[in-house]
Amino acid sequence: MLNLDFIYENRNMSESEAELCMINIIDAPDTVKAAFLTALYVKGITPDELSGFSRALRKLSSISINIDKLTDIVGTGGDHKNTINVSTAASILLSLRIKIAKHGNFGITGSHGSADFMKFIGYKFEMTEYDIIKNLNEKNYVYILAPVYNKTFAKFSNVRKKLGIKTVFNILGPLTNPLNPENLVIGAYDDETAETYASVMLKQNKRAFIVSSTMDEISPEAESHVYYVNNAIRKFDLDPLSITGKRINESNIIEKDPVKSFNIIIDAFKNKNRDAASFIALNAAPALVLNGISRDITSAYDLCINDIESGAAYERLRRISNED
C-alpha cells in the first residue's frame, strides 16, 4: 500500500520505507507521482532514501541473474560539457582485464549518450539472460540499455517533463544497474552529489570511486575531488598531472557533433589521438584499483595506456562491436 505520510509529516524516510514507497508508486496516477517528486525536491534526498529507491528499481528490473565481480563505470551527465563519452570508452578498455557490466542510455543532457556510441559501433542491445552471461564469459563485457531491462523510468517520464525540475531520477541512473555490480566508478556533476553517492555505496557494501570536477568524470586538466569507498569513505584530491605527466586542454576532448565525437574515441583506441587516449586511460584507472589489479591509480593508468599503445584496446573495441 502506498504511504506518502512523509510529505505531510515533513520527515525523511528510512531506507526500507523508501524502497517500499518506490515499488508502490510505480503505477500511481501522475498527480501522485508529481506530489512525490516535488516533495523530495523541496525536502532534499538523503542517502537512506536514495539507497532504498535504487534497491527498489533493481528489484523491478527484468533481469534476475547474479554474477560476481562485475564493475560499472558511469557518469551522471548534467555537466553540459559535451565531452567525449569517456566512461563508455573506458569500460571497453577495462574489459581487457576485468568483467564489465556497463549500464547506460541514449543521450538526454548531452548530444551523445553512451548508448548512442554503442549503437554507432554496431552493438546489439536486445539480449536474453543467456546472451548476457555468454558475452561476459567470452568478451568480459556487456552493455545494459536501461529502458530495455527496466520500464520504471519510462513510467515517470511524462511527469518529469511537466515538472521541469531536477528530480531524484536525475541521480538514480548510476545506482540502478540490474546486474548490481559490486565495484563502481561514478562521475558526479557536483561534490554534494558525489558525497551522497559515497554514502549510498557504503550502505550497500560496495567498493567505489566517486569523482567530481569541472565535469562528471576525472578532469584531464583540473583537480578532481575523489571519494574512495571500501568499508569506509576516504576523500582526497586527484591532480591529473601527477598521473599522466601532462595536462590536456579540455577543448581537445569536447565535441558537440556526435559522429565527430565518436570518431575521437575510435582514433584514441587506434592510438592516433594521444590526448583522448590519455583521458580515457585516466578515467579507466580507478576501476583497476577497485579490482586489485593495480595498487594505485598511477600504475593502473600505465597499464591502460599500454593496452592502447599495444593495439589490444582497438582489437577489443572491434570484438565488442561484433565485427569479429
From Swiss-Prot:
Cofactor binding note of this UniProt entry: Binds 2 magnesium ions per monomer.
SS bonds (residue pairs): none
Annotated residues for binding of 5-phospho-alpha-D-ribose 1-diphosphate: 75, 78-79, 83, 85-88, 102-110, 114
Protein name (record): Anthranilate phosphoribosyltransferase
Protein EC: 2.4.2.18
Family annotation (InterPro entries): Anthranilate_Pribosyl_Tfrase, Glycosyl_Trfase_fam3, Glycosyl_Trfase_fam3_N_dom, Glycosyl_Trfase_fam3_N_dom_sf, Nuc_phospho_transferase
Gene name per UniProt: trpD
Keyword Metal-binding among record annotations: yes
GO biological process: L-tryptophan biosynthetic process
Annotated catalysed reactions: N-(5-phospho-beta-D-ribosyl)anthranilate + diphosphate = 5-phospho-alpha-D-ribose 1-diphosphate + anthranilate
Residues binding anthranilate 2: 160
Family the UniProt entry places it in: Belongs to the anthranilate phosphoribosyltransferase family.
Residues annotated for Mg(2+) 2 binding in this entry: 216-217
Binding locations of anthranilate 1: 75, 105
PANTHER family linked: ANTHRANILATE PHOSPHORIBOSYLTRANSFERASE (PTHR43285:SF2)
Pathway assigned in UniProt: Amino-acid biosynthesis; L-tryptophan biosynthesis; L-tryptophan from chorismate: step 2/5
Subunit comment: Homodimer.
Gene Ontology molecular function: anthranilate phosphoribosyltransferase activity; magnesium ion binding
Function: Catalyzes the transfer of the phosphoribosyl group of 5-phosphorylribose-1-pyrophosphate (PRPP) to anthranilate to yield N-(5'-phosphoribosyl)-anthranilate (PRA).
